[in-house]
């Protein structure tokens, strides 16, 4: 619903670009259900929403690889916008993606854009999902794309599905793993604008070196409106984090309604029963005293897999379970 509501707020003109930073195929029951029943529904829900808002360019996030090559191809082919990802090599030859592009606005400004995904995809992703893909080193790909774009554009933009490796207030290094490289990209490469993601951390604006950087929070609850101007001294930027709101247009909502109704029925299907409900657990309380929800999940995983040790990851929001457990929980 966040993407559909966002689409209702966008009023494009010839000097507007709509960009997205990836991780669109994971994290919602709607997409999970759709990917398991794609042959029953003619419209890809995520692509429909992005197309409704006029998404021009986007890059891939690490979670967009979770469902394999064919699911990724179906998503990219359903999108009207162009996928830019300079460090993804398509060995299968069926993905419509480019390393970078130059978009000329109505006012004549040339916007050079590239996309990069954290190369930690190689660490996290199941090997079978990457058989037809090669994810190369993110910084090297960004550097090469910037070098190609810089001489032929007025504003150079990197859509980076990765985050900041430093504390933005103190400069303290938070991680040297290479998962997040936004600060290094901003300092060492000649991008004017760095659109980051991955960390789910709202950053309305920060200047690192000569680069203006931003990051929207997760789940399409808010979006970033960035305004740019080119003057004699170079590109100048301002940005605002804005709420998505609760209004959507009739289409593509009506086209997607049969899928939404099927998802709601699926979410209400019973999966088990507890002797008593587990109330929502605050993060600090769970960290100090343990989590009944995590304990239950781990016991189920141990029982069904025969493993010796089980770990589970809980969501960002405190959650509990009703006595009658459904897919909705």
Regions found by a protein language model. Give the residues of each.
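Non-catalytic terminal accessory segments
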Residues: 1, 11-13, 151, 254-329
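Acidic, metal/ion-coordinating pockets
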Residues: 1-246, 258, 288-300
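Short, surface-exposed linear segments at secondary-structure transitions and domain or protein termini
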Residues: 247-253
